[in-house]
Amino acid sequence: MAQTNGVLQEPAITTMNGAPVLKPASTQRIGNQLRATLLLQDINLLELIQHITHERIPERVVHARGTSAHGYFEVTDDISDVTSAAFLNRVGKQTDIFCRFSTVAGRAESAETVRDTRGFAFKMFTEEGNLDWLFLSTPVFPIRDGAKFPSFTHATKKNPRSGLPDHKAFWDYFTHNQEGIHFLMFLFSDRATPVDFQHADIFSINTYKFTKSDGSFTYVKIHLKTNQGVKNFTQDEANQKAGVDPDFQTRSLYEDIENQKYPTWDVFAQIIDPVKAENYHINIFDATKTFPFSEFPLRKFGKITLNRNVDNFFAEQEQSAFSPTNLVPGWALTPDPIIQTRALAYADTQRYRLGANFVQLPVNAPYKKPFTPLIRDGAATVNGNLGGTPNYFPSSFYNVGAATQYAQPDEEQFQGTVVNFESEVVDADYVQPRIFWEKTLAEEPGQQDNLISNVAGHLSAVTGDKGLGSSTSGLCNVR
């Protein structure tokens, strides 16, 4: 837009059908006075009021509080020996990305520096379609049985009667689901109060597969290490910042990018050979566990740089939609029960929030135009709907081009009886939490004391001897 004396010269304001509005702030009424009756024929007023009553969309169930940016992924090291993904096939190759960073439990306007896991979602616009990464700031997840996700979510949110934080429900949940103790210890360390998104490491949580065109595959976990250094608040610092500037982490990321202090992360793959995984003492599909770097070293293959803020917060950040089912050749899901559950939940919640055609929104649309003759119609179809192309397959009236041929990966072999399975907590579930306490935190001065203080502060809101005693039972099992 042109500027006059530093002021943008915009076109005249119009109604939604494009007709000019003479006085946008005026209303049609009988008589030139404030007490006069308004007229229903005032189209501008009708549009303004009817739109504002519909301009909000459903809030995300989790990860409601977030911020976004644009950037790119660059291949830094050759990794073509383990994956045929086209966006990884050449050192120096760059792929545009869009990211959304978030807290997990809080509502859309909640404070950002509170104790919580951070979500890191990346959408990569590759030449073979969009690849979505849905990662977290903790290397482990609180559950490994997908059916527990609703209970975990409810227990970490507010009381259904009072609408207030329910610390007793929180601790009661973890008392009965102690496979989450490893996650719980990360949550009450200073790692769960990062200064901002730029100063946090990022983890895939789930196990994925790298696949090759010859049908071979390896298992992989992804790690992103911040180049800004890891920086965390103490509980008191986080509380103070939440009260003074609840938008601090959004502001920090936005201002860094505006000031060309572009945040970057190095991207690593932790490769796990399928043969070794078969008999390894840790189930590679257990999201509550990590894998030692001494046996499965990190292998660098890329770098992420964020270098552009969004042009419109609602159109991009709020309407962005991510799903682990957004995959490309060379990258695949595994039987990890949590990633399988997430595969169902993410796309489904976006259809609820944004409608059946959320992928057509510019922030979500792949650079390569999809050809989906079997997926048509629905509210807000804006991509031409493939015109008169038959909406069934096969058809005598159009020829479908051949897709690039990829050998079907040699999948895991499964044989058994259908059962209702729920994992059980065993002694091995306390091994890694114990290592985290005795080694990881012990090597960082003051971190063991901070964890104890953070837990004690949270437990102080749990009333009743029974509630307090049962709440600490899981942590006592770590020692």
UniProtKB/Swiss-Prot annotation:
Entry keyword Hydrolase: no
SUPFAM superfamilies assigned to the protein according to its UniProt record, in alphabetical order: Heme-dependent catalase-like
Covalent S-S links between cysteines: none
GO cellular component: mitochondrion; peroxisomal matrix
A Pfam family: Catalase
Main subcellular location: other
Cofactor: heme
SMART domains the record matches: Catalase
PROSITE patterns: CATALASE_2, CATALASE_3
GO biological process: hydrogen peroxide catabolic process; response to hydrogen peroxide
Places the protein is found: Peroxisome matrix
Catalytic reactions of this protein: 2 H2O2 = O2 + 2 H2O
EC number(s) recorded for this UniProt protein: 1.11.1.6
Binding site for heme: Y346
Residues the record marks as active site: H63
An MF annotation (GO) of this entry: metal ion binding
Keyword terms: Heme, Hydrogen peroxide, Iron, Metal-binding, Oxidoreductase, Peroxidase, Peroxisome
Function: Catalyzes the degradation of hydrogen peroxide (H(2)O(2)) generated by peroxisomal oxidases to water and oxygen, thereby protecting cells from the toxic effects of hydrogen peroxide.
UniProt similarity note: Belongs to the catalase family.
UniProt protein name: Catalase A
Species per Swiss-Prot/TrEMBL record: Botryotinia fuckeliana (Noble rot fungus)
